């Protein structure tokens, strides 16, 4: 292994680190800015499931973690402050809200012609401004805003690092061979998505990494579909762990989270497998970052909104 490969590996690892740290920093700043309002909002929910879905989506979009939202829900159910019906609605909304990060990442799809519209163009500036705000402001609210700004900047700078480290090797046979294997085996693709998301404790982060690979034109459509479905299931691990030692109703709330996502994986995985068998050219097509965002949003939203009608 020559020095170029080692350098690219270090750059990719650094990119993942910046992306994850940026996302967590942004989420922490948003949570502190909102204070206890989000928990109060959850506590005041009525039995209106549609309202619960909207609230779950909004809260998850703010804190960038469906797992964290579901953990809060499990805690409320365990304390008797929320019914299972209310919890199910919030969990549905939490899964929909987690797709926001995918759309933010997909903005990196903008090419040089629209460089000034690409958030990555402003990433270093945002990091600098946010750092000055954090260091020199004496007000907590302003410092929280600085954390949000730094987090956004680090998130996009991390994506840039990951993308640039992969770019020189996109023509390497190992990429095409790996995604061909994953694309031809739905269970393998779903399993990879589950494992990566469970390890990172964030479906937003794992989807973001997949989108970065897609930006470099190395991800086939069938592989991306199966991996994304697995990522949705993997996002349930945190809530399942948090439900240990809680009441039966709280455990049911956590189980509903994973059941929704398994149902979605079975539905879209089956439909995808049939379509890819009929149209092999579609399966081999290199998917874009935006297309991953579209599928991620549609699959999650359709599954949960259909469940809400039943």
Show the residue positions of the predicted features.
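Membrane-interfacial helix-loop connectors
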Residues: 72-94, 102-121, 197-234, 243-249, ...
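Membrane-embedded alpha-helical segments of transport systems
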Residues: 62-69, 88-104, 120-125, 155, ...
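Conserved small/polar residues in nucleotide/adenosyl-binding loops
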Residues: 303-310
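Short helix-coil transition sites and intra-membrane helix breaks within transmembrane domains
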Residues: 16, 27-31, 60-68, 166-167, ...
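Alpha-helical transmembrane segments of multi-pass membrane proteins, especially transporters
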Residues: 36, 44, 56, 60, ...
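Helix-loop-helix hairpins and the membrane-proximal interhelical loops
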Residues: 3-45, 49, 149-191, 195, ...
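Hydrophobic alpha-helical transmembrane segments of multi-pass integral membrane proteins
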Residues: 46-72, 186-209
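Interfacial loop-to-helix junctions that mark the boundaries of transmembrane helices
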Residues: 2-10, 111-121, 179-181, 294
